[in-house]
Design a protein with these regions (language model features):
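Short, glycine-biased loop/turn motifs at secondary-structure junctions and
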Residues: 1-284
Length: 284
């Protein structure tokens, strides 16, 4: 993806076999995994441009950007922003008081975007509508990808397993969740977005588009492009009304393969991440 330079769909998709599409999907997944694990300094200009555009979509002015070198340094700066539980409470309250939290509005437009992208998928999208087999409605098994295709598992299911689910395992379960748990120390943290570690859903819808299995309108491509730019360009970020706190990417990331998986999933090694200020959380 360039500017949304979602890359163009592969040529002559009508004659492309499921196996060929899968091989192309593996390359796309690796591109996004590399972004998710990048240790290059943040592209601050791109980040601030895309965050300003996303703020504008919820009718908010450009915030002041506060850059920090680690999530640890961000914590004192984001005190008072709503936690995830507080955002859910606002959504569930039939008569909420006051102005909706900015983070809630951001979550809403992100969810709406994902719904529109799903509607552009040419097959039933497992992201929103679980695809099941047979009269009993059993879920499709997760098998080695080529074996799965040969066994009749739909390509759309294999792509969801092999891109969306696999990148979530690597970048959420394998990275951001243990780091966040270490950072929180058992207490609540304000809701945030994860920049490069939000790659799973962006990569999934990018791959479907590039494989010729989804069609998105110009506005959706532009909107997706801004979220993609954040994945390619920065670490975690906490949005506030006046200030948006953004974390640079780590200085060091060391991973190891997750045993028994089919889609090149990885996880952090113990102590496998160090941020630019020296914060080096020790992971169990």
């Amino acid at each position: 993806m360039r500017r949304y330079a979602a890359a163009e769909p592969v040529a002559d998709v009508r004659s492309t076999s499921a196996h060929d599409r899968w091989q192309e999907a593996v390359k796309i997944r690796q591109e996004w995994l590399d972004h998710g694990l990048s240790t290059q300094p943040a592209d601050r200009r791109t980040v601030e441009h895309s965050l300003t555009a996303i703020y504008a979509r919820i009718s908010r002015p450009k915030p002041r950007f506060e850059w920090v070198d680690s999530p640890y340094k961000a914590v004192p700066l984001v005190a008072g922003l709503p936690t995830l539980d507080q955002l859910y409470g606002w959504i569930r309250d039939p008569h909420p008081r006051g102005t909706p939290p900015l983070a809630g509005d951001l979550a809403m437009i992100e969810s709406q975007l994902r719904g529109v992208l799903s509607a552009g998928v040419s097959h039933t999208d497992p992201e929103l509508s679980p695809v099941r087999r047979g009269k009993r409605g059993e879920p499709w098994p997760e098998l080695p990808p080529l074996k799965a295709l040969d066994a009749g598992v739909p390509l759309g299911v294999v792509l969801h397993q092999g891109i969306r689910t696999a990148l979530h395992r690597s970048l959420a379960q394998g990275f951001r969740i243990p780091i966040r748990n270490t950072l929180a120390g058992g207490g609540p943290l304000p809701a945030c977005w994860y920049g490069q570690q939000d790659a799973a859903w962006v990569a999934y819808y990018d791959a479907l588009h590039r494989l010729g299995l989804a069609s998105y309108g110009p506005d959706e491509l532009e909107h997706l492009g801004h979220w993609a730019a954040l994945v390619r360009s920065c670490g975690w970020w906490w949005p506030g009304e006046e200030v948006c706190v953004v974390v640079d990417r780590p200085e060091v990331i060391r991973t190891e393969p997750v045993p028994g998986t089919w889609h090149d999933e990885v996880r952090l090694r113990r102590g496998g991440v160090r941020y630019r200020d020296g914060w080096h959380p020790l992971l169990a």
